[in-house]
Amino acid sequence: MPKSPKIPAELVNLATTGNSDAQFELAELYMQSENEDDITLAEEWALKAAALGHVEAMYWLGEGYAFYAKELREEDPSEAETYFGHAHHWLKQAAALKHPTAILELAGFYRRGDVVDKDVAKSIELVQQAAELGEAQAMRDLAFIYENALGIDADEVKAKYWHNKADAVEQCLVLK
């Protein structure tokens, strides 16, 4: 039987009193388990934290649901669609709070047409927004979009700008 993670009582007490940081920390701890019941608890605590406005919990839920939906896509398209819907909901919530990685993930929904109408212009707009908020991968994606005229006119100057900006952001991350 898979072993459950050690959960500090103080953390549970904080989470139970409505501390969203503690709730999200609990979710992350439970998610490290291989026990199915603990995975369910992880989701429950993350949902509580997200409901209280915890932006990282919102993003975490969106990413988790999207990952699960992709795994289900072949064997159960209807169930996958449900989970893509959950993912879209939470990524949209996190994006509304300016979470750059959530915005970039949301762009993918519009690019692929997952539970939303395919909208390349909206996808590019979201990639740009994430890039402007400092998301290095979004900067790289935007540079690629400009280089290859993917849904917009090619623009070598903008492509170079976004490549350079991504390099600078990544260099700062390396130095930290």
Regions found by a protein language model. Give the residues of each.
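Hydrophobic face of amphipathic alpha-helices that form TPR/SEL1-like repeat modules
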Residues: E25-Q32, W60-E74, I103-R112, F144-N148
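Short helix-capping/linker turns of helical repeat alpha-solenoids
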Residues: T17-N19, Q32-S33, L52-V55, Y68, ...
